Design a protein with these regions (language model features):
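Primarily recognizes the serine-hydrolase "nucleophile elbow" in alpha/beta-hydrolase
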Residues: 1-65
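Hydrophobic anchor at the start of a short beta-strand
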Residues: 12, 102, 131-133
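Histidine-centered divalent metal-coordination motifs
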Residues: 17, 106, 142
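Short, proline-enriched alpha-helix->beta-strand connector loops that line the catalytic pocket
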Residues: 44-48, 97-102, 128
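Alpha/beta-hydrolase
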Residues: 56-67, 103, 120, 127-130
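Mobile cap/lid helix-loop segments that gate and shape the active-site cleft of serine hydrolases
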Residues: 61-94
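Short beta-strand/loop motif that positions the catalytic acidic residue
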Residues: 104-106, 110
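C-terminal catalytic histidine-bearing segment of alpha/beta-hydrolase fold enzymes
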Residues: 112-165
Length: 165
């Protein structure tokens, strides 16, 4: 599809929730992974727009926060001290700046993935010259972001549409 001349990459967005939000941000920065990394690919996809819904942006921070009952250690095959190269290549925050447009939507009372994950990403992205947007939703937790019946849903839709204008 991306080879089709009618395909407008500027009007597409990668969107994910939680671990999927991590992957959306990671894919947007994957072109910055060093050639020596096992995560490097010469067949990368260009991502112009990424939406993270309560995503994990920093695997080192997620490890320190003990998110997911040890899932980060299992995903990365060890701790940040044991495999710093894996954490660097797998953490979206370490791949900044990306040049992509990012919108991070996060509930202020999310107790699954703390909003500090999105705040840290936005702060670092801004320092490095990217211009991300953080949509912080008061009284919203983790799963409301993917519930079309929740009060958070209009903000999620708005985040996506803001990247497609």
């Amino acid at each position: 599809m991306s080879q089709d001349p009618r395909f407008d990459r500027t009007r597409t967005a990668i969107i994910g929730h939680s671990a999927g939000g991590h992957l959306a941000l990671w894919l947007a920065g994957s072109h910055r992974i060093s050639k020596g990394s096992p995560l490097h690919s010469d067949k990368r996809q260009v991502v112009n727009n990424a939406v993270s819904l309560a995503g994990v942006s920093d695997l080192g921070l997620a490890w320190r926060q003990k998110l997911g009952h040890g899932i980060v250690t299992r995903l990365m095959g060890g701790t940040p001290e044991e495999h710093p190269d894996r954490y660097d290549a797998g953490s979206p925050i370490e791949l900044l700046p990306t040049g992509a447009r990012h919108v991070l939507v996060h509930g202020a009372v999310d107790d699954t993935v703390p909003i500090s994950q999105s705040e840290a990403f936005v702060e670092r992205a801004e320092k490095l010259g990217d211009r991300p947007t953080l949509v912080k939703l008061d009284r919203i937790g983790h799963y409301e972001l993917i519930d079309p019946e929740s009060e958070a849903w209009p903000s999620v839709v708005g985040a996506v549409l803001s990247l497609l204008d």
